[in-house]
Structures are given as C-alpha cells and as structure tokens.
C-alpha cells in the first residue's frame, strides 16, 4: 500500500506541508489558516464510509492517510487546484484530502447508494479534537469553496 511507506501525519510534519520551503516565499498559511485549531473543530464526530474501492483506507496500524500526503499546500494555487480536483468525484487524481462529514443522514444515504454497487461499507468515526491534537487540519468544504472561489461541481448549493 502506498500509505505504508509514509508515517502518520503529526504536528511536526503537517506545518512542513503548509508553509513554504524557502523563507523568502509568501505562505498562504499566513493569509488563510489551515493550521489545526480547536476553535474550528466541529461539535460532532467526523464520519467516513469506505470500502475496498475507496482511495483512502486505514493502514494496519489504523492510520488513515490521503492518497497524496506529501503534497505541499503552501500557496493559494496548490490549495485551490487540489481542492477543486478533490470535490469532483470523476477526477481520480491522488490528493492530500480525506472526505468526512458530520451528517449521519448524508452517510446513511451514501452507504445505501454504494452498497448495491460496491458491497459492504465500513464506517469510521473520528473525534475532530484528536485530529487537531495531532496537528491535522479539519476543513469545512463550503468555507474553502467560498474562500478559493471554487465552483460547486454538483450544484448542491455548496451543501457539504
């Protein structure tokens, strides 16, 4: 598995992906924080269903990595481009994100849709504060779409 060759992301590794390598470069992280902050944490658990066909699956040690954990997100273009691709389910290019929701209804609907086509689904529940304690950002898709002026590929009025 690709994720096996990477260590789980933590608070030492994540800032390296958010800030530029060269000191003289302008960092998007100074302008628009993605750094993990408890004040941004959802009040509900993060929910994700996955199956044998899902791009991000837990490793043997329980770590769930994105398909491109090494991708740099230190400038507006890299964030906008990678997030635009992530939102479009037809684009299967590895990216630095893992999708979660706080909506049990959305998870239930997705599971019912997938089970007929893809078989059994596994539900993973994550405490957002655990992610933040490990230095991992928790992003709100609609807020990021608004900030980076990303068009909703499915016309859902940015209900993510």
Regions found by a protein language model. Name each.
Residues 1-160:
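NAD-dependent ADP-ribosyltransferases
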């Amino acid at each position: 598995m690709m994720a096996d060759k990477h260590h789980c992301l933590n608070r030492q590794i994540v800032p390296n992906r958010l800030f530029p390598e060269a000191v003289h470069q302008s960092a998007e992280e100074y302008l628009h924080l993605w750094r993990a902050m408890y004040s941004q944490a959802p009040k509900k658990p993060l929910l994700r269903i996955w199956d044998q066909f899902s791009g991000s699956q837990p490793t043997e040690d329980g770590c769930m990595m994105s398909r491109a954990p090494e991708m740099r997100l230190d400038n507006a273009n890299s964030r906008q481009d990678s997030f635009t691709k992530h939102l479009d389910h037809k684009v299967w290019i590895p990216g630095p994100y893992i999708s979660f929701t706080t909506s049990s209804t959305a998870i239930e609907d997705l599971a019912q849709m997938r089970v007929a086509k893809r078989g059994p689904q596994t539900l993973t529940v994550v405490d957002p504060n655990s992610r933040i304690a490990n230095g991992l950002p928790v992003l709100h898709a609609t807020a990021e779409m608004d900030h980076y002026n990303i068009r909703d590929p499915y016309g859902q009025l940015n209900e993510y």
